[in-house]
Amino acid sequence: MTTLYIDADACPVKSEAERVATRLRLPMVLVCNGGLRPPANPLVSLVIVPEGPDAADQWIAAHCGPGDVVVTTDLPLADRCLKAGAQVVQPDGEVLTPANIGPRLATRDLMQDIRAADPFHQGRGGGFGKAERARFLQSLDRVMAAAQRIG
């Protein structure tokens, strides 16, 4: 059965993802290292991992597989999930695939190097609003439908 995993620390689309999971009657797992209230929705579970670098990422990567969907902005986690057979959607609605994750990781690494070399370099830092939420919902619907055919 398809499960929706959310890298929940600082995820801006938890409520939108919950609406989709509820409509499709599929389980959703919020994974974080604290700070979230247990959900009232019986389809949504909360996994609190120990404090530490990448603990939530490690848990998600260990539990997701073919037919599952992961929502994250973390590109190394996305890469691990894709290799495990899961599908990945970013909160802005971008769908990550085995074909586009390599260039995305390379760009991420390049930007880290630029920021390290130039402390005054400013990132794009765009806002997150209705358009991004709408794009996320469209992408999540499409990816969840495909995942259900697999799972």
Curated annotation (Swiss-Prot):
Checking InterPro entries in the record gives: UPF0178 (IPR003791)
Top-level taxonomic group: Bacteria
List the Pfam families hit by this protein, alphabetically.
DUF188
- Into which family does the record put it? Belongs to the UPF0178 family.
Record PANTHER family:
UPF0178 PROTEIN YAII
Q: What NCBIfam families does its record include?
A: PRK00124.1
Q: What is this protein called?
A: UPF0178 protein Pden_1915
Q: Lineage from the top down?
A: Bacteria, Pseudomonadati, Pseudomonadota, Alphaproteobacteria, Rhodobacterales
